[in-house]
Amino acid sequence: MSALEKIAQWPADNVAGALLAPTGVETIGDTAREYDIKSVTKLVVAMGIMLAVEEGAVELDQPAGPEGSTLRHLLSHASGVDFDSRQAKRPVGDRRIYSSAGYEWAAEIVSEAAGMPFEEYLDEGLLKPLGMNSTRLEGSAGHGLISSVNDLVKFASEVLDPQIIHPDTLAEMRTIQFPDLRGIVPGYGMHRPCPWGLGFEIHGEKNPHWMGTNMPADAAGHFGMSGTYLWVAGDYAMVALADRDFGEWAKPLWQETNEEIWAGIQAADD
């Protein structure tokens, strides 16, 4: 049995996934089906914002968010703002406070600088060029994307081999920002430290963790509370989408799935 087929055992009405490798893309399920991907949104939105940085519409270290915060702080959950409000929960740079409100704030700044709604900017700058024609932002820039496995494969391919965004920009996105910060990964508790890039959560030494325990420290990605995730590690990437909200069912199954897939990758590469 292919390791990817483990996804078919998840207790959800609909599941689909893809494994990207140097030799090609393996898929399972209806890869054209649209899903509410929740916080996997942050990966796509962060790349859209970084395109605005490349274009000079905004600067990564310009003031943004609460006093003393920058766009960099907002994108790496270091601004101190709460999850769902712009109220400061902690001082800037004090702790990794996971925040969708911070992404909404960052997207608003880009929208003002670009002179157009952020969803339009994202569509014109990133989604259309990548051919992500089933992907659209409906509401929050922190968790409002609708997408499909097919489209997220295109996004993951851009992360593996950037054609639209500059490789240096992508490298910065996958570099740990404010590396000593501790923080909580939703559903997985406090981690000291809790590494995060710009958009991308970095695996580091986190345990327990949705990516599993055998992934490389620089593996990067995100999961969504709707039962979705995307990770990139080395020359490989995985997309998994389900229509059952994240919960206790997901913790063992996601970890087992990812550990089995990564073990298979390592065995094949040896």
Regions found by a protein language model. Give the residues of each.
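Short, contiguous, well-ordered secondary-structure segments
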Residues: D84-R95, E104-V110
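Catalytic loop of the DD-peptidase/beta-lactamase superfamily, centered on the K-T-G motif
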Residues: M1-D36, D94-R95, S111, M116, ...
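Active-site SXXK
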Residues: L4, D36-L60, W105-S111, L152, ...
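Active-site helix/loop module of the DD-peptidase/beta-lactamase fold
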Residues: Y35-V40, A52-A88, E112-G144, I164, ...
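Generic detector of well-ordered secondary structure
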Residues: L51, S76, E108, K128, ...
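Short alpha-helix boundary/capping elements
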Residues: T23-G24, V45, S79
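Extracytoplasmic/secreted proteins, especially bacterial periplasmic and envelope-associated proteins
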Residues: T70-H73, A101, W105, Y121, ...
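Aromatic- and histidine-enriched alpha-helix N-cap/loop-to-helix transition segments
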Residues: Y35-V44, P66-S69, I97-E104, I146-N150
